[in-house]
């Protein structure tokens, strides 16, 4: 699970920030990180791990986020394969949930590898655009 946490010290943008500009920043961020996201996705897909046994998937996702200096809590909520990554502090919260377990007998035919990297991409896009929109204060 990834969590984006807002700041109590948010300020409104001094100039209007269009949806098109926001989309452009998000798309550029995701496009830039796409090769690394695909590598993580392929690692998870090629190494299916059933529920509560997703050690490699957990390590792959947390290492990726830690490498980008996000605050990551491994083994969050008393679950060995859960994690929380935060951006900002206090205030509003936006939560992106990721699934990365495989199903018995079919591996990742369920697509959970994609349900891991898609919210990760959304989290990274949000973490890039929100400070530029002055919606969040960046703590990296």
Regions found by a protein language model. Name each.
Residues 2-137:
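Acidic/His- and Gly-rich active-site-bordering loop/insert found
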Residues 140:
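Active-site rim/loop-helix segments in enzyme catalytic domains that contact anionic ligands
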């Amino acid at each position: 699970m990834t969590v984006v946490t807002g700041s109590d010290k948010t300020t409104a943008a001094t100039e209007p920030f269009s949806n098109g500009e926001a989309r452009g920043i998000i798309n550029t961020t995701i496009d830039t990180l796409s090769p690394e996201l695909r590598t993580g996705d392929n690692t998870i897909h090629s190494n299916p791990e059933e529920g509560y046994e997703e050690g490699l998937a957990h390590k792959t996702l947390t290492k990726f986020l830690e490498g980008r200096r996000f605050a990551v809590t491994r083994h969050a909520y008393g679950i060995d394969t859960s994690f929380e990554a935060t951006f900002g502090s206090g205030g509003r919260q936006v939560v992106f949930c990721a699934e990365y377990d495989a199903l018995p007998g079919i591996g990742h035919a369920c697509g959970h590898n994609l349900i891991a990297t898609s919210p990760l991409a959304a989290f990274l896009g949000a973490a890039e655009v929100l400070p530029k929109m002055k919606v969040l204060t960046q703590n990296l």
